[in-house]
Amino acid sequence: MCTLSFMYPNSLLDGTCKTVALGDSKPRYNKQRSSCFDPLIIGNCTDQQQLCGLSWGVDKAKGRRGGTVSNLKAVVDVDKRVESYGSSDVEGNESGSYDAIVIGSGIGGLVAATQLAVKGAKVLVLEKYVIPGGSSGFYERDGYKFDVGSSVMFGFSDKGNLNLITQALAAVGRKLEVIPDPTTVHFHLPNDLSVRIHREYDDFIEELVSKFPHEKEGIIKFYSECWKIFNSLNSLELKSLEEPIYLFGQFFKKPLECLTLAYYLPQNAGSIARKYIRDPGLLSFIDAECFIVSTVNALQTPMINASMVLCDRHFGGINYPVGGVGEIAKSLAKGLDDHGSQILYRANVTSIILDNGKAVGVKLSDGRKFYAKTIVSNATRWDTFGKLLKAENLPKEEENFQKAYVKAPSFLSIHMGVKADVLPPDTDCHHFVLEDDWTNLEKPYGSIFLSIPTVLDSSLAPEGHHILHIFTTSSIEDWEGLSPKDYEAKKEVVAERIISRLEKTLFPGLKSSILFKEVGTPKTHRRYLARDSGTYGPMPRGTPKGLLGMPFNTTAIDGLYCVGDSCFPGQGVIAVAFSGVMCAHRVAADLGFEKKSDVLDSALLRLLGWLRTLA
């Protein structure tokens, strides 16, 4: 739900994002809505069909004047809705003239593709849907522009080495305006514990200590250890950890920082917290902090991952892109096109083509085939090795991965448009709600994450309205085997319960203020995001040894690479963006666009493979 933050070379910083000043209690960015997509579309919007009305849930929604709109279609009329900067009619390519084919246009896939294109590679991205972004995409309905996934955006700062989104955009000559969020998240927890994560670190520590004054020393020591890790990463130029020339170069430049990270690589946040903290309520709070990073508690969350989020929210801060999260993918897609590569939409890859054990191409559902020197899968590892490749030929390395990690649950998502006056003045943008019992933290529907992006950018909704995006963990098994009628009825029942909890805890009168509502289930995520069981990503079966067991980008299949949330370092927009940078660097070295040593490569990959067996 939340995101991790890593680094990209610092030389690309200048001019890549513009910060919009905060207002007072009103929405912090007001902009006249345009009838077309501004400069990110190739061609004139007046000559193109507008992408609007995208819907990835089926629900009975209240009309904006209180009436009822039935059966909002989940299927887009793709002939009318395809973005003009994408293509859908590229012929199959038998020659293998592409340097790389990327399956999927999620953020990880787009970053890998754009980084390769910048290095001079010819890249083709194949996207099943009609817009880019995957979980970081968007859809529009009745004047509302909804983020598909999380609205908590790291990586947009203008300082340090961990502003990966800023620099990924800059690499292809793109920039986005952003709005700083003064509060990362407002926790509403058992025993009336209310904690705001302020942008300023000292303000956050002061508030947390005021709730647990007897744990002041432990609080400072735990978060100081997080900063030790963060500062080590912030000093490094992170690229592919599978590329030895780069890796050894960084070690010789920054040996202390590299050794610090190596020390914490197999450790988890919960075990570190317990060195300094005894209060069970405070430890449970740290569990909640980690849960929004990894969907598991602190004892199962790698310390490096936790440190990135718990510190970068104060260092670089949370910054929301003007126009919504979908602007990130749109900008990267435009940048890819500007650099001579392309995205093919409505391109449903059904299999990876092997030739003597080497990945050489892909086949689409319509029969077209495309060939390239390398194949990069932005699908989950379960989809890649269970569907795009034959599961019975699962490599040993993937067997080991699936023994150590399971598919995390999916989510129930509720997108709503509400009357603005239901929200109190100075309402925070992001909320985490767990009312009564800490043991419900990881249970289905136990905790609720809420984003109200119109608190920051009012242009996302009609005047006088707000957007609420609610999500809570849910397993696909809860939604299988239902008739269409029972499926719709269950969505209404579950959504009603979730909304009632928010009405009781945060916003009295919420139900009566609803003007639009649409519900998505794990089946929705599976269908539109092409994710096995709609999963959020991998989570450890037991207590992991930090990040030691997470696979990198190379695979046991020659010519096949993976990128995204089932690769190191894991889930979250910045994490998958970093995965994309790592993947592009490794692929570029293998294609001859970067320096490479075959002898060192072989030795390092064997070492990394052995280390993963220790997890």
From Swiss-Prot:
Major place of residence: plastid
Deletion phenotype: Plants display fruits with orange color due to an accumulation of prolycopene, explaining the tangerine mutant name.
GO CC, any one term: chloroplast membrane
Compartmental location: Plastid, Chloroplast membrane
Keyword annotations: Carotenoid biosynthesis, Chloroplast, FAD, Flavoprotein, Isomerase, Membrane, NAD, NADP, Plastid, Transit peptide
EC number from the UniProt entry: 5.2.1.13
Recorded metabolic or biological pathway in which this protein acts: Carotenoid biosynthesis; lycopene biosynthesis
Catalytic reaction(s) noted: 7,7',9,9'-tetra-cis-lycopene = all-trans-lycopene
Domain of life the protein comes from: Eukaryota
GO process terms (BP): carotenoid biosynthetic process
UniProt-listed Gene3D superfamilies: 3.90.660.50, FAD/NAD(P)-binding domain
Signal sequence region: none
Mode of membrane association: Peripheral membrane protein
Cofactor(s) required for function per UniProt: NAD(+); NADP(+); FAD
Annotated tissue distribution: Expressed in fruits, with a strong expression during the breaker stage of fruit ripening.
SUPFAM superfamilies (alphabetical): FAD/NAD(P)-binding domain
A single MF term (Gene Ontology): oxidoreductase activity
Keyword field contains Cell membrane: no
InterPro entries according to UniProt: Amino_oxidase, CrtISO, CrtISO-like, FAD/NAD-bd_sf
Similarity section: Belongs to the carotenoid/retinoid oxidoreductase family. CrtISO subfamily.
Function in brief: Carotene cis-trans-isomerase that converts 7,9,9'-tri-cis-neurosporene to 9'-cis-neurosporene and 7,9,9',7'-tetra-cis-lycopene (also known as prolycopene) into all-trans-lycopene. Isomerization requires redox-active components, suggesting that isomerization is achieved by a reversible redox reaction acting at specific double bonds. Isomerizes adjacent cis-double bonds at C7 and C9 pairwise into the trans-configuration, but is incapable of isomerizing single cis-double bonds at C9 and C9'.
Protein name: Prolycopene isomerase, chloroplastic
Gene (UniProt): CRTISO
